Amino acid sequence: MTNQQTEEYIYKICSIKNWKTAKQTGVFKGFGIDLIDGYIHFSSKDQVKETARLHFNGEKELLLLKVETKNLEIKWEKSRKDQLFPHLYDELPLSEIVSVFELKLDENNKHLFPSYLDD
């Protein structure tokens, strides 16, 4: 099921290693489950912290990519708990990434997110 939900920005958590590969090739192709499923998994602002907790809990050397959606064909499809998640069935041009934030861990091994996600 798809929905034409719109958000100005969506978010992708990736490793520093995957980011370095993307910078070398000029596009982000995703990794792991993205390559298996045939699309890049993203999260909305309201979903990204839960995505980190469920899929990247305690992992180091991670980045948060903030991606502008206006030039992308994003499909919103049901996933975890029937929520609609943004998916991209294409490579992500690096020009659509507006910021890269290092996700450090706090003393409890939880990721620290940028304050703009709390707005």
Task: Say what each PLM segment does.
Residues 2-119:
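Conserved, structured core segments of small domains
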